[in-house]
Structure formats: C-alpha cells, structure tokens
C-alpha cells in the first residue's frame, strides 16, 4: 500500500518506538495522529511529523481509561478524515519473577497491553470496513512467542494480543482490512528498563537494536501485507524451534537463565 494521502494513528507516540514509527509514517506521506500521556513530549514529536505532514495531530490521553477510548477514536476519525492505519504501540513492561508478582501487577499489564488496544481497534474497525480498506498493526514482542524468564505477565499480555490478531486476520478476510503484528526483541532508546517495579533485564543490553529497525518493520508489513515480522528476523527461527519441541526449549532457557544469574 502507499501511505501518501493516508492517515495513521500511533499510540505510545511520545518517545521510543512509537515516536520513531510516527515520524517514519509521516515521512512516507501519511497524516499522523499521535496518542500518549505526556503532552510536552508529544508536542515535540508532532512538530517533527508536521515537517512532512502538516495536517498531523495529537491527543494527550491515558489509554488505561478504557471508557474514554471510544471518544478518542471518534475524535481521531473526525480530525484525520478517517483512520487508515492504526499502530497499537502503547504498552508497559513487567519484569519480575512470577513468585514476586502481585495479582494487581498482572492485571495492570493485561489492561494496557491487551484490553486497551483491543478497545481502540474495535472502535476504529467499523470505519475501516465501511471504507473497504485499513491496516491494523499490533506492537507485540518476541516474548509473545517465547515466554522469557521473569516476564510472565508481560509475555502473557503480548501473547493474548498476538492471538487476538491471528483470529482477526481470518475474520477480516475479504473486507479490505489487513492485520499485522511486529514482534521486537530488545530495543534501545526506550525508558522501559528504568521504570520502577521492574528487575534488571537478564539479556545483555548491548544487544539492543535501534527503534528505527522496528519502524522499518512496520513500513515493510504495510507494504507487503505480511502478517508477522520479527525484529530481528532470526527470532522467527527460535520461535519455530520452540514450537517443534517445547520441552527442549524450556530446558534450554532454564540452563541459560541459571548461567546468566550465576554469581
């Protein structure tokens, strides 16, 4: 698809992956709507987007307020002249051993990472179906397919989102609306590693990839129609290996985790 003259709504757009994706979409010719809580940072991203797409707009909104999402979606459609591309990027981490996890923390992660994007998607979907076109992008994680240690709540939320997207891809066949999931690994340039209530990552942070690689993956799935794209791509081989022998995969992750945590 061409993005020239189309509109795109990006959540979690005030920094990190969301900001870079929004700017990439604007540079490709789309009018971009930005959604995040931090108005000051959104204004900075909006200014950069407007260098390419002057009609871009922003909404300072808290997506954990599920009851406000329908009004946000309606306002975005009015302002942007319909939403052709939705990138559900807003989310939160939760890096904690399951024996240290509280029920409230698990629910909070599922609330923002799964229920919120589902609400926004369902609010915008009727307009896409009516127009006979649209692209729904979920920002997943390799954790959705691999279930890494110390990330049970986060992995479950991204797995739920991925499963919803898989079913939706079949349900929307023939409507003109396409469905995509981008599954990033460790990405630099975010603030997620420093948020309170999270353990230090077990993985080596020097392996983190720039968010521009995620933005490139979003543009690629929009252009190709591909359902799922890993960043980096070789994680698809790891996911396939896990599917072939889950017991062996879990045994290997246990050994890797023991080695990483050894004094």
Residue ranges and their predicted role:
Residues 7, 14-15:
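Conserved glycine-rich cofactor-binding loop
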Residues 30-45:
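Conserved glycine-rich Rossmann-like NAD(P)H-binding loop of the short-chain dehydrogenase/reductase
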Residues 39, 60-71, 103:
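The beta1-alpha1 cofactor-binding region of Rossmann-like NAD(H)/NADP(H)-dependent oxidoreductases
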Residues 97-98, 105-107:
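Substrate-binding pocket helix/loop in short-chain dehydrogenase/reductase
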Residues 121, 157:
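Active-site helix of classical SDR
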Residues 141:
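Residue(s) in the substrate-gating loop at a strand-loop-helix junction
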Residues 181, 201-238:
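C-terminal helical subdomain
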């Amino acid at each position: 698809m061409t993005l020239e003259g189309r509109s795109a709504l990006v959540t979690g757009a005030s920094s990190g992956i969301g900001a870079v994706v929004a700017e990439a979409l604007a540079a490709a010719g789309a009018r971009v709507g930005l959604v995040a809580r931090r108005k000051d940072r959104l204004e900075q991203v909006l200014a950069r987007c407007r260098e390419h797409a002057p009609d871009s707009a922003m909404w300072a909104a808290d997506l954990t307020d599920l009851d406000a999402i329908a009004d946000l979606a309606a306002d975005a459609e009015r302002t942007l002249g319909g939403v052709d591309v939705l990138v559900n990027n807003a989310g939160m981490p939760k890096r904690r051993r399951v024996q240290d996890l509280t029920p409230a923390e698990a629910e909070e992660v599922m609330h923002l990472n799964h229920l919120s994007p589902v609400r926004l998607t369902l609010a915008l979907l009727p307009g896409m179906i009516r127009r006979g076109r649209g692209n729904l992008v979920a920002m997943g994680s390799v954790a959705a397919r691999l279930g890494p240690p110390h990330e049970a709540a986060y992995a479950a939320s991204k797995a739920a989102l991925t499963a919803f997207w898989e079913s939706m891809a079949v349900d929307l066949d023939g409507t003109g609306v396409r469905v995509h999931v981008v599954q990033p690994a460790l990405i630099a340039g975010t603030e997620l590693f420093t948020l309170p209530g999270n353990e230090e990552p077990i993985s080596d942070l020097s392996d983190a990839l720039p968010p521009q690689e995620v933005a490139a993956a979003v543009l690629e799935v929009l252009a190709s129609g591909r359902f799922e794209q890993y960043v980096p791509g070789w994680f698809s081989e790891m996911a396939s290996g896990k599917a072939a022998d889950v017991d062996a995969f879990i045994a290997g992750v246990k050994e890797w985790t023991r080695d990483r945590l050894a004094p």
